[in-house]
């Protein structure tokens, strides 16, 4: 696949300038089965495509072409724009769109958690993608903290799954580093109560406005 015409070669490091890109390993996508929550789909998780930081030197166009070849239709990005610049992929969101991948950008600070309203928006968008059988991928920087938290929350929406079962499911596919901070761990455990309170207050507000 040729790179989109509107993307200038100078915006991305070319493989001619960095021969190491020729030898890079394929982007590693972990596929989380959602059968435990009565969904036949799999949710993809990965680290930041195209990342150039410290000893990581990936080629953004190759990674994006790989995602396209996997059939990815929707991607959820949890990196902030500051992170995208830091890791030298400032135009990643535009590139996804130019390759025909629907992009959902929900920035969450590294190691942090979303506010409950933003979290519910993410859950609704994820559920819609999966319900419509769209091949969906989520990523942050390392694909272990924020992405794994979002995937855990999606599982935990099911009454049949405990927080630890959700974490174990993610660690089965992403390794022991999944869910990286105490803040994320606590957020998961408190999620159902906070979500119930949020939805209740939202419904109350809606009723008062409609009167």
Swiss-Prot record:
The segments labelled Interaction with CDK2 in the record are 1-34
* Molecular function via GO: protein serine/threonine phosphatase activity; protein tyrosine phosphatase activity
Q: What is its EC number?
A: 3.1.3.16, 3.1.3.48
One GO CC annotation: cytosol
Lineage: superkingdom: Eukaryota
> What catalytic activity does the UniProt entry give for this protein?
O-phospho-L-tyrosyl-[protein] + H2O = L-tyrosyl-[protein] + phosphate; O-phospho-L-seryl-[protein] + H2O = L-seryl-[protein] + phosphate; O-phospho-L-threonyl-[protein] + H2O = L-threonyl-[protein] + phosphate
Against CDD domains, the record matches this protein to:
CDKN3-like
GO biological process terms held by the UniProt record: DNA damage response; regulation of cell cycle
Q: Where is the signal peptide?
A: none
Region annotation Disordered: residue ranges?
Answer: 1-20
**Keyword annotations:** Cell cycle, Cytoplasm, Hydrolase, Protein phosphatase
Record: active site: 140
State whether keyword Cytoplasm applies. Answer: yes
UniProt cross-references to InterPro entries, sorted A to Z = CDK_inhib_3, CDKN3, Prot-tyrosine_phosphatase-like, PTP, Tyr_Pase_cat, Tyr_Pase_dom, TYR_PHOSPHATASE_DUAL_dom
Please report the stretch or stretches of sequence annotated as the Tyrosine-protein phosphatase domain.
Answer: 32-200
| Class of enzymatic activity (EC top level) | hydrolase
Q: Where in the cell is it found?
A: Cytoplasm, Perinuclear region
**Which proteins does it associate with, and in what oligomeric form?**
Interacts with cyclin-dependent kinases such as CDK1, CDK2 and CDK3. Does not interact with CDK4. Interacts (via C-terminus) with phosphorylated CDK2 (via C-terminal helix). Interacts with MS4A3 (via C-terminus); the interaction enhances CDKN3 enzymatic activity.
Q: What does this protein do?
A: May play a role in cell cycle regulation. Dual specificity phosphatase active toward substrates containing either phosphotyrosine or phosphoserine residues. Dephosphorylates CDK2 at 'Thr-160' in a cyclin-dependent manner.
Family, per entry: Belongs to the protein-tyrosine phosphatase family.
Q: What is this protein called?
A: Cyclin-dependent kinase inhibitor 3
Gene coding for it:
Cdkn3
């Amino acid at each position: 696949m040729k790179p989109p015409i509107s993307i200038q070669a100078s915006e991305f490091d070319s493989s001619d300038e960095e021969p190491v890109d020729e030898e890079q390993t394929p982007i590693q996508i972990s596929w989380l089965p959602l059968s435990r929550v009565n969904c036949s789909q799999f949710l993809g998780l990965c680290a930041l495509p195209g990342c150039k930081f410290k000893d990581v030197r990936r080629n953004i166009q190759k990674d994006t072409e790989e995602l396209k070849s996997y059939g990815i239709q929707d991607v959820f990005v949890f990196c902030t724009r500051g992170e995208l610049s830091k890791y030298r992929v400032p135009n990643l969101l535009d590139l996804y769109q130019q390759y025909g991948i629907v992009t959902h950008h929900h920035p969450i600070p590294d190691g942090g958690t979303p506010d409950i309203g933003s979290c519910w928006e993410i859950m609704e968008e994820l559920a819609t993608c999966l319900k419509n059988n769209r091949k969906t991928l989520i990523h942050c920087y390392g694909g272990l903290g924020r992405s794994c938290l979002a995937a855990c929350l999606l599982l935990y929406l099911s009454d049949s799954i405990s927080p630890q079962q959700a974490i174990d499911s993610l660690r089965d596919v992403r390794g022991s580093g999944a869910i990286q901070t105490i803040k994320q761990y606590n957020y998961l455990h408190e999620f159902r109560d906070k979500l119930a309170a949020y939805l209740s207050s939202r419904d109350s507000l809606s009723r008062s406005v409609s009167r």
